[in-house]
């Protein structure tokens, strides 16, 4: 059974980290990447792309991670990759089924960090700017 993530309207929200108002592009990315709004003090917040990528970089560098091979996905997480929400470890978008298939075909592993699997989306892996971290 595929996962389901709700979509929210992020127009007019502030970034949780820098407290700047989200621009229309950041609000659209939050919605398209299926982020969830967070509430602090009863007020909803989103996340701008600059802060999100900085936090994902911090997660890759500061938190211990292990390599999770596609063949071991079910053993570790108990579900197939198609039934699991895997996000990109560079930009945070949800990986599509074809991107998860690319991981399996190319034998590119996932990062298993903080109890979650992270992979690379097509946009972050196609141009070579964002290399595989292992």
From Swiss-Prot:
Functional note: Plays a major role in the induction and maintenance of cellular transformation. E6 associates with host UBE3A/E6-AP ubiquitin-protein ligase and modulates its activity. Protects host keratinocytes from apoptosis by mediating the degradation of host BAK1. May also inhibit host immune response.
Keyword Transcription regulation: yes
Complexes and interactors: Forms homodimers. Interacts with ubiquitin-protein ligase UBE3A/E6-AP; this interaction stimulates UBE3A ubiquitin activity. Interacts with host BAK1.
ZnF start-end (unnamed): 15-51, 88-124
GO BP field: DNA-templated transcription; regulation of DNA-templated transcription; symbiont-mediated perturbation of host apoptosis; symbiont-mediated perturbation of host ubiquitin-like protein modification; symbiont-mediated suppression of host innate immune response; symbiont-mediated suppression of host type I interferon-mediated signaling pathway
Keywords for this protein: Activator, DNA-binding, Early protein, Host cytoplasm, Host nucleus, Host-virus interaction, Inhibition of host innate immune response by virus, Metal-binding, Modulation of host cell apoptosis by virus, Transcription, Transcription regulation, Viral immunoevasion, Zinc, Zinc-finger
Origin species: Bovine papillomavirus type 5
Alphabetized Gene3D superfamilies for the sequence: E6 early regulatory protein (3.30.240.40)
Name assigned to this protein: Protein E6
UniProt GO cellular component terms: host cell cytoplasm; host cell nucleus
Family: Belongs to the papillomaviridae E6 protein family.
Membrane spanning residue stretches: none
Protein location: Host cytoplasm; Host nucleus
Gene that this polypeptide is encoded by: E6
Main location as per UniProt: host cell
Entries under InterPro entries matching the protein: E6, E6_sf
A GO term, aspect molecular function: zinc ion binding
UniProt-listed Pfam families: E6
């Amino acid at each position: 059974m595929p996962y389901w993530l709700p979509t929210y309207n992020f127009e007019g929200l502030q970034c949780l980290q820098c407290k700047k108002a989200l621009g229309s592009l950041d609000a659209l990315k939050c919605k398209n990447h299926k982020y969830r709004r967070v509430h602090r003090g009863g007020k909803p917040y989103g996340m701008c792309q600059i802060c999100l990528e900085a936090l994902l970089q911090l997660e890759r560098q500061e938190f211990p991670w292990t390599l999770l091979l596609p063949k071991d996905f079910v053993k570790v997480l108990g579900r197939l990759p198609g039934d699991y929400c895997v996000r990109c470890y560079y930009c945070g978008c949800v990986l599509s089924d074809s991107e998860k298939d690319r991981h399996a075909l190319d034998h590119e592993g996932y990062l298993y960090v903080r109890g979650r699997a992270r992979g690379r989306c097509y946009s972050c892996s196609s141009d070579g700017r964002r290399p595989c971290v292992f």
